[in-house]
């Protein structure tokens, strides 16, 4: 009887794993390695998290650092796209076949052709998002979206007609798939993740990110819809309640570098898969960059001596009473430039005033070391040590 029970439990575990929807993530050279301009990124983060009339998702400029993308399809038969899965916005958009032939960014990426899809439904509502280099604009359409082997039917998304700025040209991905709360969805569109759950494609309204930090690995990581993969992390999750259902925002206890403590008495933080950096208030980040021996170079960037990485101080983020540590190798970015490798700090200063700020933004520098679970059913974010 005991053996039968064990077998049954094993079978249930296998079935639970099978119910996950998995999308492989690929890692590419970030567009920021072509256009390194932290000042531009700071402007975009301000727009993203400091909108005058409430949260407004911003689609691209702080994706200068987005290195991880995955494959989706839209339409019947399926048309393929590479998208960044972004927890800091809630809409899905891809370039449209109807974009102007003078739009270089559009020409260089995969484009959705409504005329070639038998499941296309016209919507036509105007769509636009304002950011530093101009406005991404287009219109809404509805079609079937495929990802991880499942099909999300009647999904409304944006066809982008105008994609301004060189960032679009350099990007290795075609569009963005937002995974934030519906409250920040432009035009009130129901996000893809919501429809996945509502249509019974996943058992639980949970998704999780595993980012492979091994540069020699074939795959960049994985996003799992429906739960978390226990093979990708060790120990238990530390859960933090979402205190603002827009972005994945929560309370952080403190940030520590040696005996120096920042974010005193607690502060607000956001887990954002749309950027690889960690951002925080300018005065505090400046102090952190000095503490790690960073040398200011240009546009808010700090260079670090690559040979000193093993000796750099541990930086600890205290979340839910537990310390999540980053070593020098975790928070220093190696960038190839003119045939040489330079090392840049993964910390960026940005001041976001009240009521939305001040904020810390934990991007891929943090998520790469700590497997991250986004649990919309319980309105919480969980962190565990990635394998």
From Swiss-Prot:
May degrade organelles involved in the biosynthesis and secretion of vitellogenin. Glycans are attached at residue 123. The lineage of its organism: Eukaryota, Metazoa, Ecdysozoa, Arthropoda, Hexapoda. Residues 19-53 form a propeptide. Belongs to the peptidase A1 family. The active site is at 86, 272. Residues 68-384 form the Peptidase A1 domain. Homodimer. Residues 1-18 form the signal peptide. CDD domains: Cathepsin_D_like (cd05485). Disulfide bonds join 99-106, 263-267, 306-343. Its EC number is 3.4.23.-. It holds the Pfam family A1_Propeptide. GO terms for cellular component: lysosome. This is Lysosomal aspartic protease. It is found in: Lysosome. Keywords: Aspartyl protease, Disulfide bond, Glycoprotein, Hydrolase, Lysosome, Protease, Signal, Zymogen. One of its GO terms (molecular function) is aspartic-type endopeptidase activity. It is an enzyme of class 3 (hydrolase). GO terms for biological process: proteolysis. PANTHER family: BETA-SITE APP-CLEAVING ENZYME, ISOFORM A-RELATED. The keyword Magnesium does not apply.
